[in-house]
Amino acid sequence: MKRTLSILLTIAMIISLIPAVFAADVPTMSTTVDKTEVQPGDTITLTLSIDKTITNLNNWEWAIYFDKTAYVKTSGELEPGCMSGTGTTGAVGDNVDILGKNAIRVSGLSTTGDPVTLNAGKIATVTFTATENITAENARIEVKTEALPDYDTLKDNDVK
């Protein structure tokens, strides 16, 4: 009985390691903010980064969701050198409605059809100013992967 249990536990342990082995090549997206508490009128800066270079993309996009009664986007820019390839272009956009939610798109693409490389490190910086309507209930900012072919399992991030 002990031997059977030992074999089953060993098999279970090996099976549980399989996703980690295959996920080792998947890049990790991270978001950081420069403040942990925000009051009306405060400015916060959100930085979006990835830990591994991603090659052979036609396009990529993250969406930063936030309550527009709580924050106003005051600036946003892609990090110089975050993309490489022939005919690449990208931007940190203005407010858009995505399926009924307010968001800002951070995106890039190839205008020539040549592959785009998204380089490891800082991708974009976005600055927000908290409005007088900010509360604990509406202060959440959420970053989601909207378009990143072959990496649809990339973990999304919440900034609270």
Sequence positions of predicted segments:
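Positively charged n-region of N-terminal signal peptides that target proteins for export
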Residues: 1-9
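Acidic, low-complexity intrinsically disordered segments
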Residues: 14, 18-160
